[in-house]
């Protein structure tokens, strides 16, 4: 029974190997390899090559997009830097202008204050002169009144009979 199982498992190999069978199987294997190479291997390699080219193109495009993005980023950074410099220049100019205007306003205010002060001094002097003139007038008129009373009194003292 064991012998029958071996024949069944090993087939003809258990009885001996035939040279024609080996050549036939080798020839069929070579034909199979040639057919596989022509109909399976070559198309498979073409597909793999196309896939490789596609992936390489995608990588190249991604690299180009990355370089463009970096270029745009650098341009944006330059624009931002220029914008900041322009802003700083504007702010500095505004500060200078404000300082100049402040100095002009202060100088103008001082000049105006000086003019007002001089006008006030002149007004005070004029009013002082007017007051002095009015005072002289009053003194003169009081002097005349007093003098006339003194003269009248002297006259009445000299003329007791009247």
Curated annotation (Swiss-Prot):
Keyword Transmembrane: yes
InterPro entries in alphabetical order: ATP_synth_B-like_membr_sf, ATP_synth_b/b'su_bac/chlpt, ATP_synth_F0_bsu_bac, ATP_synthase_B_chain
Keywords: ATP synthesis, Cell membrane, CF(0), Hydrogen ion transport, Ion transport, Membrane, Transmembrane, Transmembrane helix, Transport
GO-annotated molecular function: proton-transporting ATP synthase activity, rotational mechanism; proton-transporting ATPase activity, rotational mechanism
Gene Ontology cellular component list: plasma membrane; proton-transporting ATP synthase complex
Classification via Pfam families: ATP-synt_B
Superkingdom, taxonomy of origin: Bacteria
Coiled-coil regions listed in the entry: none
Topology term for the membrane: Single-pass membrane protein
Annotated TM spans: 16-36
Main location: membrane
Compartments, record wording: Cell membrane
PANTHER family per UniProt: ATP SYNTHASE SUBUNIT B, ATP SYNTHASE SUBUNIT B', CHLOROPLASTIC
NCBIfam families: ATP_synt_b (TIGR01144)
Family the UniProt entry places it in: Belongs to the ATPase B chain family.
Physiological role: F(1)F(0) ATP synthase produces ATP from ADP in the presence of a proton or sodium gradient. F-type ATPases consist of two structural domains, F(1) containing the extramembraneous catalytic core and F(0) containing the membrane proton channel, linked together by a central stalk and a peripheral stalk. During catalysis, ATP synthesis in the catalytic domain of F(1) is coupled via a rotary mechanism of the central stalk subunits to proton translocation.
UniProt subunit comment: F-type ATPases have 2 components, F(1) - the catalytic core - and F(0) - the membrane proton channel. F(1) has five subunits: alpha(3), beta(3), gamma(1), delta(1), epsilon(1). F(0) has three main subunits: a(1), b(2) and c(10-14). The alpha and beta chains form an alternating ring which encloses part of the gamma chain. F(1) is attached to F(0) by a central stalk formed by the gamma and epsilon chains, while a peripheral stalk is formed by the delta and b chains.
Protein name per the record: ATP synthase subunit b
Native organism: Bacillus caldotenax
